[in-house]
Amino acid sequence: MTLSASLSPQPFGRIVTAMVTPFDSSGAVDFQLAARLARHLVEQGSDGLLVCGTTGESPTLSWDEQLKLLEAVREAVGSSAQVLAGTGSNSTSEAVKATREAAAVGADGALVVVPYYNKPPQEGLEVHFRAIAEAAPTLPLMLYNIPGRTGCHIEAETVACLMDCPNIVSFKAASGTTEEVTALRLACGSRLAIYSGDDGLTLPMLSVGAVGVVSVASHVAGPQIRAMIDAYVEGEVGAALAQHEQLIPLFKALFATTNPIPVKAALEINGWSVGAPRPPLSSLPEAMRTTLSNTLSALRQT
């Protein structure tokens, strides 16, 4: 028995990799390496690529860099994957402008984070997201709730009020609980495609109605994550659980400190010279790097 029929549509597939941004030795964006990495991720099972999200270090990229990166990835993968642009801001006017520009350069969708630092009330969040949706009415949007970083949480009831915006099609749930998925499904029904925003919660979230994951770990474990999701969707829950349990050490190692510090180190260990994160982020401490290297080695043997 497959579970596909009970799930919402998957507007961006099952696995969207939140791409790192490669930097060269001078700290400049390495657009050629970004293109190579994008093609590799698609070959490893990614249905979509998110450019300039949290993992892509958007806070330390200029908007000019972000647009050029989006264009480079879009050109690199062509029609083989959907490309989403991170266009969120705590300024509604800036988010509107960024989303329009992303649509103009060929993005397939935009990830729009809940505004950070200024902590708007729920009424303000509804106005914010409605303005973005109306500014780019043909661009599919994924709302992004990550209160641990933003200091602000969007309620399921507020999301439900936005369901009259036809291009708000999905939601990245990164509050750290499966209860968020349940609340969203009760409020919005199957109209809203919910993606796990936490690799370690992908399988639990699938079990309560999520359709996929916006993944960091898929940089280095794309086939294994694909196998886990496919097994679950095909009703092979035991196989999915076994794959999930094999991946848990990797998930822990990749989030032992602030993302994307560990995943950039993991890519370096695997031969991808993506460079260190831009300050104020730092390189991975040596002890954590050793643990990560051992975890990657063990995963390759499974």
Swiss-Prot record:
<feature type="active site" description="Schiff-base intermediate with substrate">
    <location>
        <position position="172"/>
    </location>
</feature>
<dbReference type="GO" id="GO:0005829">
    <property type="term" value="C:cytosol"/>
</dbReference>
<dbReference type="InterPro" id="IPR013785">
    <property type="entry name" value="Aldolase_TIM"/>
</dbReference>
<feature type="site" description="Part of a proton relay during catalysis">
    <location>
        <position position="54"/>
    </location>
</feature>
<comment type="subunit">
    <text>Homotetramer; dimer of dimers.</text>
</comment>
<dbReference type="InterPro" id="IPR020625">
    <property type="entry name" value="Schiff_base-form_aldolases_AS"/>
</dbReference>
<comment type="similarity">
    <text>Belongs to the DapA family.</text>
</comment>
<keyword id="KW-0704">Schiff base</keyword>
<keyword id="KW-0220">Diaminopimelate biosynthesis</keyword>
<comment type="pathway">
    <text>Amino-acid biosynthesis; L-lysine biosynthesis via DAP pathway; (S)-tetrahydrodipicolinate from L-aspartate: step 3/4.</text>
</comment>
<feature type="binding site">
    <location>
        <position position="55"/>
    </location>
    <ligand>
        <name>pyruvate</name>
    </ligand>
</feature>
<dbReference type="GO" id="GO:0009089">
    <property type="term" value="P:lysine biosynthetic process via diaminopimelate"/>
</dbReference>
<feature type="site" description="Part of a proton relay during catalysis">
    <location>
        <position position="117"/>
    </location>
</feature>
<feature type="binding site">
    <location>
        <position position="214"/>
    </location>
    <ligand>
        <name>pyruvate</name>
    </ligand>
</feature>
<keyword id="KW-0457">Lysine biosynthesis</keyword>
<dbReference type="Pfam" id="PF00701">
    <property type="entry name" value="DHDPS"/>
</dbReference>
<feature type="active site" description="Proton donor/acceptor">
    <location>
        <position position="144"/>
    </location>
</feature>
<dbReference type="InterPro" id="IPR020624">
    <property type="entry name" value="Schiff_base-form_aldolases_CS"/>
</dbReference>
<keyword id="KW-0456">Lyase</keyword>
<dbReference type="GO" id="GO:0019877">
    <property type="term" value="P:diaminopimelate biosynthetic process"/>
</dbReference>
<dbReference type="GO" id="GO:0008840">
    <property type="term" value="F:4-hydroxy-tetrahydrodipicolinate synthase activity"/>
</dbReference>
<keyword id="KW-0028">Amino-acid biosynthesis</keyword>
<comment type="function">
    <text>Catalyzes the condensation of (S)-aspartate-beta-semialdehyde [(S)-ASA] and pyruvate to 4-hydroxy-tetrahydrodipicolinate (HTPA).</text>
</comment>
<keyword id="KW-0963">Cytoplasm</keyword>
<protein>
    <recommendedName>
        <fullName>4-hydroxy-tetrahydrodipicolinate synthase</fullName>
        <ecNumber>4.3.3.7</ecNumber>
    </recommendedName>
</protein>
<dbReference type="InterPro" id="IPR002220">
    <property type="entry name" value="DapA-like"/>
</dbReference>
<dbReference type="InterPro" id="IPR005263">
    <property type="entry name" value="DapA"/>
</dbReference>
